[in-house]
UniProtKB/Swiss-Prot annotation:
This is 3-phosphoshikimate 1-carboxyvinyltransferase. Keywords: Amino-acid biosynthesis, Aromatic amino acid biosynthesis, Cytoplasm, Transferase. It catalyses: 3-phosphoshikimate + phosphoenolpyruvate = 5-O-(1-carboxyvinyl)-3-phosphoshikimate + phosphate. The active site is at 314 (proton acceptor). The gene is aroA. GO terms for biological process: amino acid biosynthetic process; aromatic amino acid family biosynthetic process; chorismate biosynthetic process. Monomer. 3-phosphoshikimate binds at residues 22-23, 27, 170-172, 198, 314, 337, 341. It holds the Pfam family EPSP_synthase. Its main location: cytoplasm. It is an enzyme of class 2 (transferase). GO terms for cellular component: cytoplasm. Its EC number is 2.5.1.19.
Length: 426
């Protein structure tokens, strides 16, 4: 097993230009593929999850050209749903941002499809999405375990209807239905059962749909009305914002050991909810300065917070390791959906935080972290989860080194993360 030991970092200072957002990159690729016309996507994220989407689109007959560096992609739209001449099996790794939207899009396409992935993907629920698609008369069969991939889809023309969808596990299920609904023949009303998690990710979906000329009526996130017979219209250029979740590690590092750190690619104008990670740092004591497309943090002594972080579920993981440098006990609440991500992140974070000496309480949907007087050197297991690896790199901001097992798992969203961290480390 490969390991990376990070020696103690004395100070953090500098500027970071963020890679493109994973959430926006895969949404943009799929919508551009369904659109009328040719779209040029810039600042596309170069990562495993994006490669899985690109490979799937190629198998589905979508033509695109990718720049040598991988950050620009020109997509020739299909002008609607896909049409596969022969049965296809699409391997999507552990990319939820590919699995869920493609499941919906292929249910409304012509052809037979199997969607599968790596072992962890087969543990990530998809049942609520399949149940919702069944209300549109989709034909989807579980091939191994009920409610989980792999699935077999017999695609056909779907008609709009009133759909009830459980919003309590993942916002990606709603995103998937929203993205296909405008292309159906009749109108669709989507009603949310329970509390909708991760609302900012729905805002991302609605924003990109609007950019591609499709409208949705949002009734306070309790229901959505989508007119049928709409079509996505290609954009000459769509620039993917920097990844706000990836920004969190550098912002936290600046808050802990700054110096001054500026991240470019997100700011006041960003559509991503994870930009509000900076607000949490400010509540903990950091000094934050906002511009339209950048955020600057200046390090100050940090104190613990007790907050509902359902609105920033990915970035909230970074607060769990930032808590190691704050005075008092930090509690992160309403984060049950950590359990259905790339790994059971609540359990993983609790386990690894204890290794470095923290006192941790792991609840069903919350975690409390009390830092030790001094951190212990530990080998951090990363569970093939990019965010666990990046979160625990912050331990090196102490007087203690940290060893990251399987550091290349960051390739899912940020292949050169450790190089970027070194650039701002003094």
């Amino acid at each position: 097993m490969e390991q990376l030991t990070l020696n103690p970092i004395g100070k953090i200072n500098g500027e970071i230009f963020l890679p493109g957002s994973k959430s926006l990159s895969n949404r943009a690729l799929l919508i551009a593929a369904l659109a009328n016309g040719v779209t040029k996507i810039t600042n596309l994220l170069v990562s495993d999850d994006i490669n899985h989407m690109l490979n799937a689109l190629k198998s589905l007959g979508i033509e695109y050209t990718l720049s040598d560096c991988g950050t620009e992609c020109t997509v020739i739209g299909n002008g609607g749903f896909f049409n596969a001449k022969k049965p296809l099996e699409l391997y999507l790794g552990n990319a939820g941002t590919a699995m869920r939207p493609l499941c919906a899009a292929l249910a409304a396409s012509e052809g037979e499809f199997i969607l599968t992935g790596e072992p962890r993907m087969k543990e990530r629920p998809i049942g609520h999405l399949v149940d919702a698609l069944a209300q549109l008369d989709a034909d989807i069969e579980y091939l191994e375990n009920k409610d989980y991939p792999p699935v077999k889809i017999k695609g056909k023309a779907l008609t709009g209807n009133t759909v009830t969808i459980d919003g309590s596990i993942s916002s990606q299920f709603l995103t998937a239905i929203l993205m296909i609904a405008p292309l159906l023949e009749t109108n669709t009303t989507i009603e949310i059962d329970g509390e909708l998690v991760s609302k900012p990710y729905i805002d991302i979906t609605l924003d990109i749909m609007r950019r591609f000329n499709v409208s949705v009526q949002n009734n306070d996130y309790k229901s959505f009305i989508v007119n049928g017979k709409q079509s996505y219209q290609a954009l000459d250029k769509y620039m993917v914002e920097g990844d706000a979740s990836s920004a969190s590690y550098f912002l936290a590092a600046g808050a802990i050991k700054g110096g001054e750190v500026t991240v470019h690619g997100i700011g006041k104008l960003s559509v991503q909810g994870d930009k509000h990670f900076a607000d949490v740092l400010e509540k903990m004591g950091a000094e934050i300065h906002w511009k339209d497309e950048s955020i600057t943090v200046i390090g100050k002594p940090l104190t613990a917070v007790d907050m509902d972080m359902n609105h920033i579920p990915d970035a909230a993981m970074t607060i769990a390791t930032t808590a190691l440098f704050a005075t008092g006990t930090t509690t992160i609440r309403n984060i049950y959906n950590w359990r259905v991500k790339e790994t059971d992140r609540l359990n993983a974070m609790a386990t690894e935080l204890r290794k470095v000496g923290a006192e941790v309480v792991e609840g069903k949907d919350y975690i409390s972290i009390t830092p030790p007087k001094s951190l212990k050197h530990a080998e951090i297991d990363t569970y093939n989860d990019h965010r666990v690896a990046m979160c625990f790199s912050l331990v090196a901001l102490s007087d203690t080194p940290v060893t990251i097992n399987d550091p290349k798992c960051t390739a899912k969203t940020f292949p050169d993360y450790f190089d970027k961290l070194a650039q701002v480390s003094c």
